[in-house]
Regions:
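Short, internal strand/loop/helix patches
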Residues: 120-158, 287
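Short active-site neighborhood of thiol/selenol oxidoreductases, capturing the structured segment around
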Residues: 63-82, 105
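Non-catalytic, surface beta->alpha helical segment in thiol-disulfide oxidoreductase systems
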Residues: 164-185
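Loop/turn elements at helix/coil->beta-strand transitions in domains of secreted/extracellular proteins
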Residues: 69-72, 101-104, 131-133, 160
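Non-globular targeting/processing and membrane-anchoring segments
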Residues: 14, 40, 45-51, 178-362
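N-terminal "domain-start" segment that seeds a small globular fold
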Residues: 34-65
């Protein structure tokens, strides 16, 4: 990666954490922002340039002159981030509802994993996820740094004069965000748009997390970031090694079986029939993974508590647990119904040539 990024930044931020993070961002404008604290939407600084883009997708490049007189919503995203995926139904709906009423939505794709630098992968994600608004590719973090941004996802709301007036870190607060859009449009003189709020029907990985039943947190499987890896021999860094399961797994512990190489950011399967087991407590279990060589595919089979998943299968798996890794992306493998309990997940790969990066839950 071109820049070291704190992977934990993608997690949803609570109210206190958002306040602390906002104070750390350069866009807050110091004394100027403080002098306008009584305003409903204070000035937080000027909208930074998007000139550091690697490429533009869904649009020709949009300079400041193109955005003058428009309300602009900037959304930092990376396509494997499940927290961002859960915000996407709202962003799509806002872009569609307000596009003819003065709003320009721009997605800034700043990659987390190495394969997310690949523009072909970003193009695939845009098409698969039905993103029709402009996307600026920020592969070298130039725009990320210009905004002093720290999180996926983040939303910045700019008025028609190019001033940032509001920001949202992480998921949630969708009604407030849409009211901000409406207020900025009204302030700019745009009329004739309904003040009703959008209604969305999220599917698959876009469904909001079940926070009441979430007892497992994101876990990267590369040695730099992973936690609770309990195969008996421990980690053999950057070496092909035969791993085995322990006698049992505790909650949020995971293990490997078969011949794997554990790298800094990912694990790679060297021989067919390799397995990963993970004991978890959540409605959803997702895994970011992909073939080691693009253009190939890897078959897999998922189980839960030693049985096919049946009705608990995720969007990318059938009831018998069968699926195929084709793209480098997030795969939703388990979606349970209530009651949620501690469960043991296992995935067996029937072919070699697989890389796995990150477990997420929801």
């Amino acid at each position: 990666m071109s820049e070291s990024i704190d992977h934990n930044r993608r997690h949803f931020l609570g109210t206190a954490a958002m306040t602390i993070a906002a104070a750390q961002l350069g866009i807050l404008g110091g004394a100027k922002a403080q002098s306008l604290q009584t305003a409903r939407l204070p000035f937080e600084g000027d909208l930074p340039s998007l000139g550091g883009a690697t490429a533009w997708l869904n649009s020709s490049p949009l300079a400041a002159s193109h955005l003058r007189g428009k309300v602009v919503l900037i959304n930092f995203w990376t396509y494997t981030c499940v927290n961002w995926r859960r915000t996407l139904p709202y962003t799509r709906a806002w872009a569609d509802k307000y596009k003819d009423h003065g709003l320009v939505v721009i997605g800034v794709h700043t990659p987390e994993f190495p394969f997310e630098h690949n523009i072909a992968n970003i193009r695939w994600a845009i098409k698969d996820m039905e993103i029709n608004y402009p996307v600026v590719v920020d592969s070298y973090y130039a725009i990320w740094r210009a905004f002093n941004n720290e999180y996926w996802p983040t939303f910045y709301f700019s008025d028609s004069k190019g001033h940032i007036r509001h920001h949202q870190f992480g998921e949630g607060d969708y009604q407030q965000s849409e009211r901000v859009i409406q207020e900025l449009l009204a302030e700019a003189g745009f009329r004739g748009v309904s003040d009703d709020l959008v209604s969305v029907d999220p599917r698959g990985a876009e469904v909001a997390a079940d926070l009441d039943n979430l007892r497992s947190s994101e876990n990267y499987v590369g040695y730099e970031q992973t936690a609770n890896f309990v195969s008996p021999t421990g980690t053999r860094r950057n070496k092909s090694h035969g791993y085995a399961y322990p006698a049992q797994l505790g909650l949020n512990h995971w293990a490997l079986q078969g011949n794997w190489t554990i790298g800094k950011e990912a694990i790679a399967l060297n021989q067919a029939a390799g397995r990963i087991a993970y004991r978890f407590h959540s409605r959803d279990l997702n895994l970011v993974m992909g073939p080691t060589v693009q253009g190939t595919s890897v078959r897999f089979r998922v189980g839960i508590d030693g049985q096919p998943p049946g009705s608990t299968h995720g969007f990318d798996v059938d009831a018998q647990g069968n699926g195929t890794v084709v793209e480098q992306r997030l795969y939703q493998l388990i979606r349970q119904s209530s009651p949620i309990a501690d469960r043991q997940f296992e995935i067996e790969f029937l072919d070699s040539g697989l890389q796995a990066f990150d477990f997420t839950f929801g």
